[in-house]
Amino acid sequence: MEWNYLYNHFDPVAFDLWGLKVHWYGIAYVLALLVALWVAKWIAKKDAYPLSNEQLESYFIWVEVGVILGARLGYILFYDPFTAYYLTHPWQIFNPFQNGEFIGIRGMSYHGAVIGFLIASFLFAQRHGVKFWMLMDLVGISVPLGYVFGRIGNFLNQELIGRVTEVPWGIYVAGVLRHPSQLYEAFLEGIVLFVILYAWRSRVKFTGQLGIMYLILYALARFVAEFWREPDAQIGYLVGGVTMGQLLSLAMAIPCLVLWGYLAKKERGKIL
């Protein structure tokens, strides 16, 4: 079986469970969460974070709810062409059925997930008396490896496809050779970010630096990866050939840079 024709021989459905189709994407998503939690526990123990495994497990449940809500709502607001419909029919936003058939919840936005994650993290920190910025540092270094599985899930689900190409490692999608952009993102936004953040741990100057650094680096990696990724059909290219993903990444990076400067200045003030 040739790599270029992988999709012709691959079924995105892993197996049926009592009539319910379980997709490889769903399995990859669960693995992403478990890997991120495992890395968080490992780093928390290695770097002596004042958090127990029970607290981390509880925190990840909060975060998972926030991520799902934020990702879905973010997609509706940023990408979906039927935003007005969903705003007037909010009960349809999380409806996993279509014409009586279970199709799961489709349409998620990373940038919306970040917003949901931040809100859930803030509420958890307030509820349990945990430092918010400490959580950001821990998550910033634990998310990237889990993210790798998320993008692999996108690849197996044949979604978020790449742009048309002639490179020998391209993959045919509906008869058209395209970049396997999901795998590029898994490498850039996952593996590369983890290596950088892991190495930076010993150089941290203020609490929250790793968390903010992750968002800035992700925005940069995503901006670059978008040049290989096909823009959403319902949106296409924006002004100057920029994609919605690139625009949202810039919108995320700019306030993060400002926040970095503010927290760094605040820390220097403590030292002086």
From Swiss-Prot:
<dbReference type="GO" id="GO:0005886">
    <property type="term" value="C:plasma membrane"/>
</dbReference>
<feature type="transmembrane region" description="Helical">
    <location>
        <begin position="24"/>
        <end position="44"/>
    </location>
</feature>
<feature type="binding site">
    <location>
        <position position="151"/>
    </location>
    <ligand>
        <name>a 1,2-diacyl-sn-glycero-3-phospho-(1'-sn-glycerol)</name>
    </ligand>
</feature>
<feature type="transmembrane region" description="Helical">
    <location>
        <begin position="180"/>
        <end position="200"/>
    </location>
</feature>
<dbReference type="InterPro" id="IPR001640">
    <property type="entry name" value="Lgt"/>
</dbReference>
<protein>
    <recommendedName>
        <fullName>Phosphatidylglycerol--prolipoprotein diacylglyceryl transferase</fullName>
        <ecNumber>2.5.1.145</ecNumber>
    </recommendedName>
</protein>
<comment type="function">
    <text>Catalyzes the transfer of the diacylglyceryl group from phosphatidylglycerol to the sulfhydryl group of the N-terminal cysteine of a prolipoprotein, the first step in the formation of mature lipoproteins.</text>
</comment>
<dbReference type="GO" id="GO:0042158">
    <property type="term" value="P:lipoprotein biosynthetic process"/>
</dbReference>
<comment type="pathway">
    <text>Protein modification; lipoprotein biosynthesis (diacylglyceryl transfer).</text>
</comment>
<feature type="transmembrane region" description="Helical">
    <location>
        <begin position="129"/>
        <end position="149"/>
    </location>
</feature>
<keyword id="KW-0997">Cell inner membrane</keyword>
<keyword id="KW-1133">Transmembrane helix</keyword>
<keyword id="KW-1003">Cell membrane</keyword>
<feature type="transmembrane region" description="Helical">
    <location>
        <begin position="59"/>
        <end position="79"/>
    </location>
</feature>
<feature type="transmembrane region" description="Helical">
    <location>
        <begin position="244"/>
        <end position="264"/>
    </location>
</feature>
<comment type="similarity">
    <text>Belongs to the Lgt family.</text>
</comment>
<feature type="transmembrane region" description="Helical">
    <location>
        <begin position="102"/>
        <end position="122"/>
    </location>
</feature>
<keyword id="KW-0812">Transmembrane</keyword>
<dbReference type="GO" id="GO:0008961">
    <property type="term" value="F:phosphatidylglycerol-prolipoprotein diacylglyceryl transferase activity"/>
</dbReference>
<keyword id="KW-0808">Transferase</keyword>
<feature type="transmembrane region" description="Helical">
    <location>
        <begin position="208"/>
        <end position="228"/>
    </location>
</feature>
<keyword id="KW-0472">Membrane</keyword>
<dbReference type="Pfam" id="PF01790">
    <property type="entry name" value="LGT"/>
</dbReference>
